[in-house]
């Protein structure tokens, strides 16, 4: 028997793009059909079967050839020859899904090309635009967002290109500008000290003297809370807060006394200078002595004795710490 070549099954694309041809069956005349059936039923049956099989094979070949041609056609002409009215809804849905994936792939390839072009453009520096930007940034002035907003100033100050290679002691020192936000409160931004700093501190102390009354009230409330509370941990915290407030108050009072002492001494010296005498400036040690004299003058005898004993113990402890340790001898071993 001769070997029969089997055709390969059509692919999914060929099935989807296959052209379906409708079969038009003409309505046969009843008289002709009856006559033909009576005359030669066996011949028509045999011939009809043979001719039908031949026609079916020819149609299959045509369909396969058409499917092959049409499968190649969409790639070349974009699928213009397909009639959508002759396809089923399932075939159309599958075709639409396959077209969507193709479009995405094409877009991705285009996007990659664009990105590569952008990278190439970025790599090539445009010197003119950079120079123009630098000039614009220099020309641009700081402006306010609204008329009520504060003026915006840059914190970046350029360093001077001039170098002072010859510095003499006779030349006056230039005042260094400092940010007033980082200055101690009450000094008005002058960190270096001097008369201005002292004056500003005195003014601030006078302006905020009403805070002493508030602090006294807070200390009274803390004492009352310490008496009422039974929790040991909370009591310790309140006592610590009260102790810190009392120590701050003592330091403030001591500073006020020092300031009063200096102001009185300056007044006396000014009067003596007017009389033609030379001025006398108090040293730090003299200031401390006068402060101790005034402090003991306002205290009772028992309080003075206690203060002296406390001071003596403090000095003795410092002296003991300053002494070197005794060396070990053979007897100590």
From Swiss-Prot:
InterPro entries per UniProt: RRP36
Biased composition (Acidic residues): 27-46, 54-73, 114-123
Keyword annotations of the record: Coiled coil, Nucleus, Ribonucleoprotein, Ribosome biogenesis, rRNA processing
GO BP, one annotated term: maturation of SSU-rRNA from tricistronic rRNA transcript (SSU-rRNA, 5.8S rRNA, LSU-rRNA)
Coiled coil start-end: 215-275
Region annotation (Disordered) ranges: 1-85, 99-194, 242-262, 313-333
Biased composition annotated in UniProt, kind: Basic and acidic residues: 124-138, 316-333
Subunit structure: Associates with 90S and pre-40S pre-ribosomal particles.
Main function: Component of the 90S pre-ribosome involved in the maturation of rRNAs. Required for early cleavages of the pre-RNAs in the 40S ribosomal subunit maturation pathway.
Name of the molecule in the record: rRNA biogenesis protein RRP36
Organism: Sordaria macrospora (strain ATCC MYA-333 / DSM 997 / K(L3346) / K-hell)
